[in-house]
Structures are given as structure tokens and as C-alpha cells.
From Swiss-Prot:
InterPro entries membership: ATP8_mammal, ATP8_metazoa
Assembly with partners or alone: Component of the ATP synthase complex composed at least of ATP5F1A/subunit alpha, ATP5F1B/subunit beta, ATP5MC1/subunit c (homooctomer), MT-ATP6/subunit a, MT-ATP8/subunit 8, ATP5ME/subunit e, ATP5MF/subunit f, ATP5MG/subunit g, ATP5MK/subunit k, ATP5MJ/subunit j, ATP5F1C/subunit gamma, ATP5F1D/subunit delta, ATP5F1E/subunit epsilon, ATP5PF/subunit F6, ATP5PB/subunit b, ATP5PD/subunit d, ATP5PO/subunit OSCP.
Subcellular location: Mitochondrion membrane
N6-acetyllysine sites (modified residues): K54, K57
Protein's recorded name: ATP synthase F(0) complex subunit 8
Single biological process term from Gene Ontology: proton motive force-driven ATP synthesis
Membrane-related topology note: Single-pass membrane protein
Role description: Subunit 8, of the mitochondrial membrane ATP synthase complex (F(1)F(0) ATP synthase or Complex V) that produces ATP from ADP in the presence of a proton gradient across the membrane which is generated by electron transport complexes of the respiratory chain. ATP synthase complex consist of a soluble F(1) head domain - the catalytic core - and a membrane F(1) domain - the membrane proton channel. These two domains are linked by a central stalk rotating inside the F(1) region and a stationary peripheral stalk.
Coiled coil ranges: none
Gene name of the encoded protein: MT-ATP8
Amino acid sequence: MPQLDTSTWLIMISSMILTLFITFHLKVSKHYFPTNPEPKHTLLLKNSAPWEEKWTKIYSPLSLPLQ
């Protein structure tokens, strides 16, 4: 029965780990990370919707007159 040749495994695994590290480092270095993240102020941000600018009356089904 032939023996499994494992003499090149160390070089192969080492080069694979080095390649993965380099590619991961290049991918991460292309991303933009903010230096000082700050929370958003919800009071200053106001969404203007058309129904907020004019008064509308909502009729509840229970408050309508009986027919």
C-alpha cells in the first residue's frame, strides 16, 4: 500500500494562510470606517408629510350617525 506524501503540506498550508490574510487585509482596507460615530438627534430630524401640514378629521365608525 503506497504512503501518502505529506512533505509539501506545510508549504501549501502556510501559503494558503498567507494568501487568505493578504486578501482579507486588502478587502478590509478598502472599507471606510467613520472615526467618531455620533448618535443621530431624532428631535432635529422631522419628516414632512402632506398630511402633517393640513388639518384632517378622522371619522371613527362608532361616532358616525346610525342610518
